[in-house]
Amino acid sequence: MKFVFILGDAAVGKMTVGQELMKITDLRLFHNHMTIEPVIEIFGRYDGKTISEMREVIFRNFAASENYGMIFTYMMAFDQPSEWNYIEHVKKIFEPYGTEFYYVELIAPQDVRLARNVSENRLKNKPSKRDVETSNNRLLNDDKNYRCVSYEGEVPFENYLRIENSDKEPEEVAKFIKERFHL
C-alpha cells in the first residue's frame, strides 16, 4: 500500500491537488474536511475529539484493506511537536501493512491562498468555508499563530517533495507527484 501525505498551509491547494492525483492513480483521497464537515453539521461546532476518532476508524479500516493506497491532506503546523507526533501516529497505523510513505508539502504566499480560499471547488467541498469573512480571518490568524511552512531541510522524511505551487495548475502538480514517486 502507498500513503501520500499532502501537507501545507490553509488554502494552499492540498485537496485540489489530491483530487487531481486521485484521477491519475489508483490512490483514494481522504481530505481533512471529509471528517471536519460532517462533525460541524451534526454537532453544530468543531469537535476535535470526534474528528480524530472518525479519522482513526477510517485509517485502521483502510490500512487493513486491499486498496492500492491513500492520499491524506493535512494542514500541518511545523512548529508544533504535536503535529509531528500526529504524522508518526498515522504512520504507525499503516506500517504493519508494509505501507510506503510519501510526503508532499505545498507552498504558496498568503495573497495566493486568500484568492484560493474562495475558489468554487473549495466552497463546494468545504461548507464551513462559505462564510468567507470568517474563513479569511481564520487563515490570517493561523498565519500569525502557526508556522505552516517548513524550513529548508527541516522535514526528515524520505520520499519528500516541497512544491511552490502558486503558478502551477493542480493537474501539473499531481502529474509531477505521480511521476516523481512512481505512483
Predicted features and spans:
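Hydrophobic anchor at the beta1->P-loop junction of P-loop NTPases
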Residues: I6
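P-loop (Walker A) phosphate-binding loop of NTP-binding proteins
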Residues: D9
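Small-molecule kinase domains that catalyze NTP-dependent phosphoryl transfer to phosphate-bearing small molecules
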Residues: L123-V173
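Conserved substrate/cofactor phosphate-moiety recognition/catalytic segment
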Residues: Q19-A63
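Walker A/P-loop
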Residues: M15
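Conserved phosphate-donor/acceptor-positioning beta-strand/loop module used by diverse small-molecule
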Residues: E95-N117, I163
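Glycine-rich phosphate-binding loop used to anchor ATP phosphates in small-molecule kinases
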Residues: T50-E105
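ATP-binding Walker
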Residues: V12
